[in-house]
């Protein structure tokens, strides 16, 4: 282990001299596997745990999810932390916080207790995701980003598949309990974060990141897409899974099996989507995603209007998740239009924008859910249509000065 404890700094351009498993992209893959082991266990068990153990209703689950999104709204605080801690270290510390909070979740089966553990795990999750996006865009070249990000998504899905598969098998055949599942998922995430701290050097990017809040007018379309995506994502994360339990009575192993199918599909298709993104570009990829999501959410609405059954609902859940995996197209769009030194501060700002609606929307929609669950999905369909309109404003070849179709036309006219 002595050779693993070397924390020397390695310049990014010199990292190719390291063994492949110790290079920056390899670290991104390990972290991509570590995060879902805790988060996926938490997600898979949450709806059943809060209904069966904590006796939650739609209002409480809405409040819990709103509290969970507060650290995302405050992700801009990452910029302040980066004044005294490098991004790589902050990412690993955040993974430890996420894993530790998930590990102790079942010891606090009350509304108040779950608010506390959820807040801690959420700080870890959102700060990790903020830093992770920045590191991905700094460490992966523009040319390789679409396919590499596709493989990173597949790695995360594979880790989730393992976690979900063990939950299904353990619940059905070995009497797995909430306590053991949470301890195992959170504990492995902590262990992998410690491994990453010991095994990898500190990587030094030749382009220093700005340590201040960055808001640029020319990034407005990226900000708008982030806002709409955050609002829409909450409805899928909170209410689609909650519907499976409340309306169709899915048990732990059934709902987890559905998540398992989701991640299996992602493992197979995320690399393909990365290649498609490289071929068809961000505009066409995002148009495809949002058009598909508009149809999916409309059909969710139809479940309540026309009384359609569980098979359709489960199928939509899988398709829904598949479309959401295309979100890395927004990352590569920003990578193409941004100044290299803006990656870290803009990742923090973007996460805050992404979570503006996420803080209050679940709680408000929780009350709407009591009155009309179908209306929640009708609202989501409207958000997907709005995102579709925004994606049509992306030029075919986005770049600095050509961030939108309007800017691209001005550039062509000036030429």
Q: What are the language-model segments listed below?
A:
Residues 127-140, 325-338:
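Intracellular juxtamembrane helix-capping segments at the cytosolic ends
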Residues 96-109, 292-306, 392:
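C-terminal ends and interior cores of transmembrane alpha-helices
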Residues 149-165, 352-361:
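Glycine-rich segments within core transmembrane alpha-helices of 12-TM secondary carriers
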Residues 44-59, 238-255:
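Short amphipathic helix-loop junctions that connect adjacent transmembrane helices
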Residues 74-87, 171, 269-282, 369-370:
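Helix-to-loop junctions at the C-terminal end of transmembrane segments
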Residues 284-327:
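C-terminal transmembrane helical hairpin of 12-TM major facilitator-type secondary transporters
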Residues 33, 101, 112-128, 310-325:
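Hydrophobic core of transmembrane alpha-helices in multi-pass small-molecule transporters
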Residues 167-168, 186-205, 390-395:
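C-terminal membrane-cytosol helix-exit motif in multi-pass small-molecule transporters
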């Amino acid at each position: 282990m002595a050779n693993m404890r070397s924390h020397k700094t390695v310049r990014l351009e010199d990292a190719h001299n390291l063994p492949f498993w110790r290079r920056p992209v390899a670290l991104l893959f390990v972290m991509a596997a570590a995060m879902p082991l805790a988060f996926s266990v938490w997600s898979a068990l949450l709806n059943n745990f809060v209904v069966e153990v904590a006796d939650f209703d739609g209002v409480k689950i809405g409040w819990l999810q709103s509290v969970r999104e507060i650290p995302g709204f405050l992700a801009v605080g990452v910029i302040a932390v980066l004044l005294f801690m490098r991004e790589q270290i902050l990412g690993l510390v955040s993974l430890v916080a996420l894993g530790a909070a998930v590990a102790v979740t079942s010891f606090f089966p009350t509304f108040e207790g779950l608010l506390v553990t959820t807040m801690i795990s959420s700080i870890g999750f959102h700060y990790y995701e903020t830093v992770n996006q920045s590191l991905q865009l700094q460490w992966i070249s523009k040319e390789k980003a679409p396919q590499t990000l596709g493989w990173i998504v597949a790695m995360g899905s594979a880790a989730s598949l393992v976690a979900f598969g063990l939950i299904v098998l353990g619940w059905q055949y070995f009497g797995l309990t909430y306590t053991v599942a949470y301890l195992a998922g959170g504990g492995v995430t902590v262990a992998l974060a410690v491994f990453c701290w010991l095994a990898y050097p500190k990587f030094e990017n030749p382009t220093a990141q700005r340590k201040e809040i960055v808001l640029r007018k020319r990034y407005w379309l990226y900000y708008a897409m982030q806002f709409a995506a955050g609002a829409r994502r909450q409805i899928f994360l909170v209410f689609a899974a909650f519907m499976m339990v409340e309306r169709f009575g899915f048990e732990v192993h059934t709902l987890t099996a559905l998540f398992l199918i989701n991640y299996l599909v992602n493992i197979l298709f995320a690399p393909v989507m990365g290649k498609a993104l490289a071929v068809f570009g961000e505009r066409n990829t995002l148009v495809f995603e949002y058009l598909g999501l508009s149809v999916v959410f409309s059909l969710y609405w139809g479940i309540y209007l026309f009384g359609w059954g569980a098979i359709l609902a489960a199928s939509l859940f899988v398709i829904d998740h598949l479309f959401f995996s295309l979100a890395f197209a927004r990352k590569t769009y920003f990578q193409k239009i941004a100044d290299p030194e803006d990656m870290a501060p803009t990742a923090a700002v973007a996460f805050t924008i992404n979570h503006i609606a996420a803080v209050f929307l679940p709680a408000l929609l929780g009350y709407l859910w009591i009155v009309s669950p179908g209306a929640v999905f009708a609202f989501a369909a409207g958000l997907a249509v709005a995102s579709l309109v925004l994606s049509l404003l992306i030029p075919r070849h986005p770049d600095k000065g050509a961030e939108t179709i309007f800017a691209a036309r001005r550039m062509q006219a000036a030429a």
